[in-house]
Amino acid sequence: MEHHKPLLPTSSHAAPNPRTRKDLLLLLCALLFLSSLVAFGRNRASNVPHDHVSSSASNHQQEHQSPTSLPSSKWHAVSRGVSSGVSEKSSSMLFSGEGGASEAFPWDNSMLSWQRTSFHFQPEKNWMNDPNGPMYYKGWYHFFYQYNPNGAVWGDIVWGHAVSRDMIHWLHLPLAMVADQWYDKQGVWTGSATILPNGEIIMLYTGSTNESVQVQNLAYPADPSDPLLVDWIKHPGNPVLVPPPGIGAKDFRDPTTAWLTSEGKWRITIGSKLNKTGIALVYDTDDFKTYELKNGHLRAVPGTGMWECVDFFPVSKKNENGLDTSLSINGAEVKYVMKVSLDDDRHDYYTIGTYDENKVLFTPDDVKNDVGVGLRYDYGIFYASKTFYDQNMDRRILWGWIGESDSEYADVTKGWASVQSIPRTVRLDKKTGSNLLQWPVAEVESLRLRSDEFKSLKAKPGSVVSLDIETATQLDVVAEFEIDAESLQKTAQSNEEFTCSTSGGAAQRGALGPFGLLVLADEGLSEYTPVYFYVIKGRNGNLKTSFCSDQSRSSQPNDVRKQIFGNIVPVLEGEKFSLRMLVDHSIVESFAQGGRTCVTSRVYPTKAIYGAARLFLFNNATEATVTASLKIWQMNSAFIRPFPFNPDQKN
């Protein structure tokens, strides 16, 4: 049946919030039991009407395990990382902002088991953060990562290591480097790989010393003939770089992949800060053992704070292929990308511009979009990213760390924390010339199974349409949307301002939006995550489009951060509104307009899991009718397991 009821503000769908203000604790505790009964009754009775659209026979099978409820517990937030000079790594501290106790939601084993992803890379257990030293070598993609072998929280950081033939199916190898020297006693931190023209591998990484000073160290393979690169040797002359005069002992980290200068020297940059000005220091070297600090900075931006995980690479203005930094590349057909991870706000910013090798200076094309203040790789949860040139497929690949948004208590209970993004190709947007395009590597499509296709679905203002597919937990979704021409013509021009993060989410209605998809939703819409477009017709008659992901209704528990992510996305004349979405249990990666704007979310539903997870088309606009066409693939699981060493191989 037709449904015209719009999505409503959070209070209309969600159960009452059990969190209490301290000054009302006694009163609300007395009412807690009654409120819980009311909430239970509302949820049981919730049956939001909506259209059902089938492309083929659907089969919803309930796959819940027998729930084993975990006891609710007070969880005391503990700060992690700050004393070592890095940003807060405790999600519990991000919730409370102090070391007080927080009430943890009583997750059961069924819920926690569902959260583990099926085709995103993650270790078998424990904590993971930054991607390190990715490369292609002798037929294998190598991926190193920050890893705690002792628990599901940040600390005791070493380098994990895995290999793959396709960056989708992974084999875990023994730890590559551990904290066994004075210069990395407090952690083997982030680093980058450089493959020289002769095939030699150079690995530079930051070590946190026994006195928590950040220094740069050199490592190389013990056996370059080994395609798995199992064993690594740390240079006996480490550290090769220490903080220069004027730079704080805890403000000097994350060396980049080296690039070749026209003089045949190798050049790297390292993130730092001067007071609140983020800077990128530059060094030249002939042998990666001795270095010359260059005058000035590659780039400096006041007010951006500490720069971590700086990345610097060329992109072609003409071709789709990637460019190799082991070659000296510059000229009229090349742009450079500078990216920094801001320690203060934990986002990855990039800008596009020109690079003067002689002046050792990067200049943005648009200072309004300077590094640290303008464009971002991803407007959701995506940090400490790293690119590499894939000489196997002649492309540039981007990895990003996707942290958790639940409580540290839940992470410790389930025994793991964090995943990596699906690797993305990166190239210059030739149509705009002012932004990058990011897209999941083609190899992920090998996981596609059966598909459902929906053509020219009409979604009237205020409607929700059920898309009857087999399951909605592991999906690859491609969708296009069109606003009917009559609505566009009749809609009045407006000075309305809209920002995803400060809006009312998908419940905020406008003439031309929001419209998109409700993912990981339950049948009664008590939990759902909207991924959507919001369109405004400006005073000049032009359309301004935002692409957003709204977690505010994604989960009923309160020990989960429920933010609204997104940003403006350029939609050029003649283009439809297009998105692609990879859904893998608790992670949703979304790409608008071919990857001009990307948003990654972590969601932790308690009802919309296993066979109860649904997918809906929605249009919460007040005036516009939207036509949508979708193709939806069920996704297989990737094989991610320990490497099957033979008895005579290393174990």
Swiss-Prot record:
Pathway this chain belongs to: Glycan biosynthesis; sucrose metabolism
SUPFAM superfamilies, per database record: Arabinanase/levansucrase/invertase, Concanavalin A-like lectins/glucanases
Domain of life: Eukaryota
Membrane topology: Single-pass type II membrane protein
GO BP annotations, alphabetical order: sucrose metabolic process
Biased composition (Polar residues): 54-72
Glycan-carrying positions: 210, 275, 620
Alphabetized InterPro entries for the sequence: Beta-fructofuranosidase_N, ConA-like_dom_sf, Fructan_Metab_Enzymes, Glyco_hydro_32, Glyco_hydro_32_AS, Glyco_hydro_32_C, Glyco_hydro_32_N, Glyco_hydro_beta-prop_sf
Lumenal face residues: 45-651
Region entry Disordered, spans: 48-76
Residues reported in the UniProt entry to bind substrate: 127-130, 146, 154, 189-190, 253-254, 308, 343
Propeptide span(s): 1-103
EC number: 3.2.1.26
Disulfide partners: 500-548
Recorded GO CC terms: membrane; vacuolar lumen
Annotated localization: Membrane; Vacuole lumen
UniProt topological domain (Cytoplasmic) ranges: 1-23
Family assignment from sequence similarity: Belongs to the glycosyl hydrolase 32 family.
Assembly information from the UniProt record: May be present in two forms, a 70 kDa monomer and a heterodimer of the 30 kDa and 38 kDa subunits. The ratio of the levels of the two forms within cells appears to be regulated developmentally.
Identification of the protein by name: Acid beta-fructofuranosidase
Provenance organism: Phaseolus vulgaris
